[in-house]
Swiss-Prot record:
Originating gene: PNO1
GO biological process, one term: endonucleolytic cleavage to generate mature 5'-end of SSU-rRNA from (SSU-rRNA, 5.8S rRNA, LSU-rRNA)
Taxonomic path: Eukaryota, Fungi, Dikarya, Ascomycota, Pezizomycotina
Molecular function GO labels: rRNA primary transcript binding; unfolded protein binding
GO cellular component terms, A-Z: cytoplasm; nucleolus; nucleus
Name of the protein in its database record: Pre-rRNA-processing protein PNO1
Organism encoding this protein: Phaeosphaeria nodorum (strain SN15 / ATCC MYA-4574 / FGSC 10173)
Protein origin, superkingdom: Eukaryota
Cellular localization per UniProt: Cytoplasm; Nucleus, Nucleolus
Sequence ranges assigned to domain KH in this UniProt record: 183-235
Biased composition (Acidic residues): 14-23
Length: 262
């Protein structure tokens, strides 16, 4: 609190001194030399708002009559070429059939899938490799499945279907997966599946439109997903000891339903 005898300024003089101090501080602050950063207040606010929709119009997709957007077709991007290689081992008992059928095996791999193929006698394997002419990304996998199907015992003409159709599969299971059999019981189960002169196996193949290979106690089935299911059910019934005549009847019923469906 000031002393009562101290001189006091009038309010008008105090306000003038404060305004002079503020103006001096403002003049001391440097202004930017570039006028580009300054906002031109002479521009009308409506012009900027009108230009914005024109800029967005180029980015908005065109729509058809139903309101669905129309996009321009994507440009093809060149894929980076990379050498990929697969090696399929060949069992000893399939080397001789492979050498015999080799003139029928490599043409579809080279001409259709554009792969480089060679049979390595030393390592007993078939080597597959992509080339610059290979366009299908799944060509190497298809070629491996084709060679594996031949090594499992399928005919070349049946295995070629894996290259032409995409919905074919190979399912493998053993008799012991269904029922534990040993000795003569195992042989009788295999005999029931094959039938006399292979008639039962052929009947299962024709009814289910699949191909079946009996390799000792292993069973390989080539076909579509539903067709494999039909063939597997028939084979499992025979392994469990069901009468073959009853299995034939079930196959006729299923085959009739499949014909009506297709």
């Amino acid at each position: 609190m000031p002393a009562p005898t101290a001189l006091q300024r009038r309010p008008e003089e105090f306000a003038e001194n404060v305004s002079e101090d503020v103006s001096m501080e403002a003049s001391a602050v440097p202004l930017p030399e570039d006028d580009a950063d300054l906002i031109d207040m002479s521009i009308e606010p409506g012009t900027a708002i009108e230009a914005a929709p024109d800029a967005l119009a180029d980015d908005m997709p065109m729509t058809d009559e139903s309101g669905r957007p129309k996009f321009a077709p994507a440009k093809s991007i060149p894929l980076a070429f990379r050498h990929e290689q697969r090696k399929v081992p060949i069992p000893p008992h399939r080397m001789t059939p492979l050498k015999t059928a080799w003139p029928k095996i490599y043409p579809p791999l080279v001409e259709h899938l554009k792969l480089q193929v060679r049979m390595n006698i030393k390592t007993k394997s078939v080597e597959l490799r992509t080339s610059k002419s290979t366009t299908d990304t799944g060509a190497l996998q298809k070629g491996e499945d084709f060679v594996k199907a031949f090594t499992l015992g399928f005919d070349v003409d049946d295995a070629i279907a894996l290259l032409r159709l995409d919905d074919l599969y190979i399912e493998t299971f053993e008799i012991k997966d269904v029922k534990t059999l040993q000795g003569e019981h195992m042989g009788r189960a295999i005999g029931r599946i094959a039938g006399k002169d292979g008639k039962t196996k052929f009947a299962i193949e024709n009814a289910s439109r699949t191909r079946v290979v009996l390799a000792d106690s292993k069973i390989h089935i080539l076909g579509g997903f539903k067709n494999i299911h039909v063939a597997r059910e028939a084979i499992v019934s025979l392994i469990l000891g069901q009468n073959p005549s009853k299995v034939y009847g079930n196959l006729r019923t299923v085959a009739g339903r499949m014909k009506e469906r297709f």
